[in-house]
Amino acid sequence: MVLPHLDDAYGLARWLTGNQTDAEDVVQDACMRALASLETAIIERPRAWVLTIVRNTALNWLAKNRPKAVVLTDDPQVLDAAAAHRDSAPDPEEALIAAADEAALQSAIQALPHLFREVVVMRDINGMSYREIAAAIGAPQGTVMSRLARARAQLVEKLGSRA
């Protein structure tokens, strides 16, 4: 029940914690919690259930271990994405622009307030429905939509000059 959603769980944890190592720790703890509650839990939407556990575990982790800074350049996924853009782009200038745009977007998402960042990651990166997000964070669906709209507006404001 947990394994099919492990990639989404890791992605969410990575966005919430800000780095790969901490995300791995959070996902490991979340998996242990999920397995421990598997026998007693009534699970209607497994993906939302797993991501709720990951979110709560990440929030607990953040409360204890607030990161001092986020270094995006050491992130293997960013480097891989930049390399993929480089390999597929017809010229080096386009590849450089694409890598810079991706880095700027990741930086802008990381700079969002936590409540906004988590809905952007869940919706736009993990592809969760509004209903799944609402269940995962324990908020009404309208609140999810409002937070997402505000988050996107902040991203447009931060990145608008790049367009």
Where do the PLM segments sit?
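A short, charge-rich alpha-helical start-of-domain segment used by transcription regulators
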Residues: 1-11, 21-24
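C-terminal flanking helix
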Residues: 6, 10, 31, 113, ...
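Hydrophobic-face residues of short alpha-helical interaction/recognition segments
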Residues: 9, 13, 50, 54-62
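Sigma70-family region 2
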Residues: 29-46, 64-66
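Arg/Lys-rich amphipathic alpha helix in sigma70-family domain 2
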Residues: 55-74, 90, 98
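Acidic, proline/glycine-rich intrinsically disordered inter-domain spacer in sigma factors
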Residues: 78-110
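Helix-turn-helix DNA-binding module
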Residues: 107-118, 122-143
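DNA-recognition helix of helix-turn-helix
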Residues: 131, 137-161
